[in-house]
């Protein structure tokens, strides 16, 4: 029997209740809010992706208008060689040789976005990527902006970039 050695660090949700106290639910230490508050505050949820073999995906729980920020990464920029996270597929390249580590940020809900690849479009599983990653500096952050209007219930899809599959 194989023993699961995965450690999940849980913390209390960072949201306040209506009475001003702290929410009693827990969340992964890398996400500030529990599922219910992430849905209320960010208008997003994480659940099983519609794409086969893609694990979880990010879903809109409210409509987003074209150009609106849907999700973001905000963490320190590190050199890829210094960071093991780039091997997991959750690092977002901000410039050549540098990434933002989506696994160590509390606003990294964008890390759950999958890519709508051509074969998935042809099989009508998705209709193309609906957000684009935009990097800004001082401080470094990556914003996922809507390429078109997104309806509540839509899965969020972003292009991983040309180099992503070349490196795999």
Positions of PLM-derived features:
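Short, flexible, mixed-charge glycine/proline-rich loop motifs
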Residues: 2-8, 25
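Cys/His-rich Zn2+-coordinating "finger/knuckle" modules used by eukaryotic regulatory proteins
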Residues: 11-40
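Beta-strand cores of modular interaction/reader domains in eukaryotic scaffold and signaling proteins
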Residues: 12, 33, 59, 63, ...
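Intrinsically disordered, low-complexity regions enriched in proline, serine, glycine
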Residues: 22-26, 35-36, 46, 72-73, ...
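Catalytic cores of histone-lysine modification enzymes
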Residues: 41-133
């Amino acid at each position: 029997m194989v023993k699961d050695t995965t450690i999940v660090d849980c913390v209390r949700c960072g949201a306040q209740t209506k009475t001003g106290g702290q929410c009693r639910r827990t969340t992964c230490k890398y996400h500030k809010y529990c599922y219910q508050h992430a849905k209320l505050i960010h208008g997003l949820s994480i659940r099983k992706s519609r794409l086969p073999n893609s694990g979880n995906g990010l879903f809109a729980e409210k409509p987003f208008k074209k150009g609106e920020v849907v999700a973001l990464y905000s963490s320190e920029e590190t050199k890829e060689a210094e960071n093991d996270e780039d091997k997991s597929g959750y690092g977002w390249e901000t410039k050549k040789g540098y990434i933002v580590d989506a696994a160590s940020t509390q606003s990294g809900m964008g890390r759950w976005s999958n890519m709508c690849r051509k074969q998935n479009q042809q099989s009508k599983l998705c209709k193309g990527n609906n957000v684009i990653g935009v990097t800004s500096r001082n401080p470094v952050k990556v914003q996922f902006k809507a390429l078109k209007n997104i309806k509540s219930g839509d899965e969020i899809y972003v292009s991983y970039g040309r180099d992503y599959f070349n490196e795999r």
